[in-house]
Amino acid sequence: MKSLSLLLAVALGLATAVSAGPAVIECWFVEDTSGKGLAKRPGALLLRQGQGEPPPRPDLDPELYLNVHDPTGFLQAAFRRYPRDAPAPHCEMSRFVPLPASANWASGLTPARNCPRALDGAWLMVSMSSPVLSLSSLLRPQPEPQQEPVLITMATVVLTVLTHTPAPRVRLGQDALLDLSFAYMPPTSEAASSLAAGPPPFGLEWRRQHLGKGHLLLAATPGLNGQMPAAQEGAVAFAAWDDDEPWGPWTGNGTFWLPRVQPFQEGTYLATIHLPYLQGQVTLELAVYKPPKVSLMPATLAWAAPGEAPPELLCLVSHFYPPGGLEVEWELRGGPGGRSQKAEGQRWLSALRHHSDGSVSLSGHLQPPPVTTEQHGARYACRIHHPSLPASGRSAEVTLEVAGLSGPSLEDSIGLFLSAFFLLGLFKALGWAAVYLSTCKDSKKKAE
């Protein structure tokens, strides 16, 4: 009975795993309408269907309602682990034309400049993005939609490029690791037989987008001879096929490592996989951060007489990044009524001070108004909010002491005791010295 229960639990677990993630991805087909700009038409990708027929979609052009066949399982695996509470990915698809890579360093991938006939026909490039992934896939649709039982077009996945870190956040000065993986299956048996056994050569390219131009950071063509551009900024890539099956499918790795990131390195990164006449590209947005430190001056106590203003309070907010998004708030805690409230007084911020590591600092100032006796023991707090901090922010506080209202504290008592002990010892030492000098004088007189 236990074994039956175990088998049932495993079966339910497998069914849950297989059914996880969206079964249909709504997508926009984008095309250029002869110089009139871009036009969009709705489409959909059917990644998985249950038993029976595909669900009908009379609202879609049958050529844009695609029943996706994924020989590598790579695309469907990405969505099986898609979180249920994550927003649906933004999806666009467009026409794709197989061409040799334009970069000189990738010319070894296509010794023959003419595209082989095995790659003739229609191609679609599908790009998806969400907070949990960035993905591009090359699909080869059938020439005509399937008529029965539902109007739908069969499409086969040939190349998929994927990252699970589309928006990495890296602390200033630490290393950035941008994951990239890909999978490829030759589109036809003819294309596979025209190549040598094993995975084909590929090219890996990482660029950072800056002012509308892509700055090449790293390029690699594993297994091919040829002069490659030097890697920039200490970048390293783990570029290799994961397996060497003779006829595919194959998966590969193109993860990118950037040491000790600085603020100038944040921005848009483009990762491109080049195969002979085929390409796939994903986009990542790298953000650099450093949480601020906060301290208050005076450090522990602020003294003031009734009716007088306490000394100016200085809130030091140091070594943070990015400069934007910082908020400095002043609070009075434990005042009249025991509640916290917004502190009154004049307040201002200093200019930013820039540090060699790219972080910045500033100081917030508060000149409190004259105090009353009811405010004795209240605490002035400086609270800061910054994108790198939790929603509650970070704070430091100083206690307000009103002169004439505070009795001796434990520290004061200890100080008085030590002072008295020191004075007692000093008096005894002086007494002994006086006795000694008096004895010496008497001895001299007797000797005379």
Curated annotation (Swiss-Prot):
Cytoplasmic compartment ranges equal 436-448
List the transmembrane segments. Answer: 415-435
Q: How does it sit in the membrane?
A: Single-pass type I membrane protein
Q: Where is this site: May be involved in interaction with TAP?
A: K428
List residues in topological domain: Lumenal: 21-414
Disulfide bond positions: C27-C91, C315-C382
Q: What is the annotated signal peptide range for this record?
A: 1-20
Q: Which GO terms describe its biological process?
A: antigen processing and presentation of endogenous peptide antigen via MHC class I
The places in or outside the cell where this protein is found are: Endoplasmic reticulum membrane
Q: Which InterPro entries match?
A: Ig-like_dom (IPR007110), Ig-like_dom_sf (IPR036179), Ig-like_fold (IPR013783), Ig_C1-set (IPR003597), Immune_Resp_Modulators (IPR050380), Tapasin (IPR008056)
- Ig-like C1-type domain residues: 292-399
Going by the UniProt annotation, this protein carries glycans at: N253
GO cellular component terms, alphabetically, are:
endoplasmic reticulum membrane
Zinc: present as a keyword of the record? no
Entry keyword annotation includes Heme = no
Keywords (A to Z) from UniProt = Disulfide bond, Endoplasmic reticulum, Glycoprotein, Immunoglobulin domain, Membrane, Signal, Transmembrane, Transmembrane helix
Assembly, per entry: Heterodimer with PDIA3; disulfide-linked. Obligatory mediator for the interaction between newly assembled MHC class I molecules, calreticulin, PDIA3 and TAP. Up to 4 MHC class I/tapasin complexes bind to 1 TAP. Interacts with HLA-G-B2M complex; this interaction is required for loading of high affinity peptides. On its own or as part of MHC class I peptide loading complex, interacts with ligand-free MR1 or MR1-B2M complex, providing for stable MR1 pools ready for metabolite antigen processing.
Q: What does this protein do?
A: Involved in the association of MHC class I with transporter associated with antigen processing (TAP) and in the assembly of MHC class I with peptide (peptide loading).
Q: What does the record say about domains? A: The N-terminus is required for efficient association with MHC class I molecule and for a stable interaction between MHC I and calreticulin. Binding to TAP is mediated by the C-terminal region.
The cross-references to PANTHER family, in alphabetical order and at most eight, read:
TAPASIN
Q: Please give the name of this protein.
A: Tapasin
Q: Tell me the classification of the organism that encodes this protein.
A: Eukaryota, Metazoa, Chordata, Craniata, Vertebrata
Q: Which gene encodes it?
A: TAPBP
